[in-house]
Amino acid sequence: MYSFQSIVRRNINNITQQFERLAYVGNNLTNYNTKGYKTVNFEQMLNEDGYLTGAIRSDYAQGSIMVTSNPYDVAINGTGFIPVVSEDGEVAYTRDGAFKQGKDGYLMTDDGWLVGDGIKIPANCFKFEIKPNGEVFAYDNNESVSGKKIGTVPLVRFASQENLKFIGMNKFQATEESGEAQLVKNHDCIAQHNLESSNTNMYTGVNDMLRMNASLIAGMRIIKVVDDMYNKSINIREG
């Protein structure tokens, strides 16, 4: 038999879990138009004591591929990530290929992380080409037949990508559970002039948000009912 206090505690816990899940759903919807974004799911389970517990999981399903006019844009066909490095030497992995020519001519993410080991684009580059295997070539004029190789956009995979740690800004880091990044060779997965769209499903997200709002309202009503019953029982005893 549950006491008033245990019912209130359980409902407060469950409401807190629902608010946390609602925050993730809201973040997914906010990133609906973010290139390469992977939906973050807050999976809930009801334990034997009636308390909700949750686990955070990223959905790595590939989003749709869209063609762009930017030669620095790349999409990954299939599984894998592109390593990027911050100014402080921090290594992360992304599928957001909305790159640019940044400081000192290096190929960078939109927020200034170096792509791979550093790919410097020459100042006299007339044409910039990224081949399907990731090799990068620069042409100094429109009559060049064979450009100069200036680097490679690396592709890596993990033994258990589901256990990567999401650190924000479309970046992930390796964990002990995910295993170390393994360089993929002899592939044709890089598509220049393309970007991967977010894999967030707008319909599912809005539907989840509506259901959670209803659940939150119901949970708060239960607490109000229990509180009223508790106050009445106190008054009866005192009467």
Predicted regions and their residues:
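Amphipathic alpha-helical polymerization modules
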Residues: 1-239
